[in-house]
Amino acid sequence: IFSESANVNVDIDGQLEDNYTGFGYNGPRVHTITLFANPIFQKPNSNDAFVKVLQPNEDINSLDRNSFKTIVFAPGVHDIGLSYKIHNNETYYIPGDAVVKGTMHPENKWGRDATKNFKIYGSGTFSSEHIVRHPDDDDNKSVKPFTYQAEGAHLEGFVIADPAFHTLNMSHTGDANNINIYKNLKILAWRKNSDGVNAFRNSEVSDCFFRVQDDAFYLGAENVNQHHNTVWTDANGAVLFLQNINDGSTCTFSDVKVIYQRASWHWWHGGRIVSFRSLRPGNKLVNVHVKNILVEDPLPAFPSFYGRIIKKGNSQEEVAMENVIFENIHQLHDGVSSKLDDEKGKPRNTLDGLDENRTIKNIKFINCSFMGKSINGFEAGNFFTEFVDSKTIKFITTPKKN
């Protein structure tokens, strides 16, 4: 934390452009600094009777909740503990010279009883670096920075540093017109399962920067609009993970830049740009449209696409795939994984069905490219395919407009 203004000289040395830092890297540590240019946020009026300026040595949990509607975190480091409860219509301002350690949750209530219309914003830091999470402790929601259900929540501007588990994991079960907004947020994550956002329903996610070590985005179940975001992965995870999607027609996912896409292991099923790696019998992938993704990394770990149907016991249920569209997804360079192991084979763009009755089907690739060439067929995209209904996989290219 700087208490005074300072000049910053930026000297880009190209270490990440010149060196693949994923599996097989044995070079020196590459230390990075990330600079963000934020808008000037309006600071709450500290003279207002219901605005509380919280000092670092004050315990937020001991405050009379009726005495404030807005908290301003004063400069310094604050520890709010785990699962600090947010109430209706509250505002929390984190300025750039404040660090808030802990996790912050709406009430674990649904529908009209969920916490409503709260705002957390500023250019400061929300940190989980002190939180210990055991890898097998998947049910411990208290270590997630944000979870449970909310309606009309507004999160904007701040950095979430070193999340201990899934970062933004709030659902929405109330008024569909009162959406949750995630805007200009930054995640700097290092741990296993440090996923970015699963907004579930009735949400907009835009202008965010996610450096995460698991899946960055989930499509959502209903009315989730995600656009103009930037992703960086070092170890694992897809940019977009498509789970069981009953009807994705009200969700959008578009305009994403992937500046680095690295992986610490090259033979698992996780880290791709678009992944539906674990469809199971009984699942659906219906009315999904993903568009405008650019992979800028000169040394990406993998090709862009991975789709797979896996067993679910002895289930004979079908897998429904209808109207799945991938449009304007471009990756200039081949996956580095092709160069580092001759025994396990080269990871490729992959479409892998389960059997003759449960195939990968009904996908359109529209104006996509790989290694600088249009994907106009399986060969051009260097696809591995098994149990694929090739008659329903369409590759469409249209001439560029002048």
Where are these regions (language model features)?
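Extracellular beta-rich repeat passengers
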Residues: 264-402
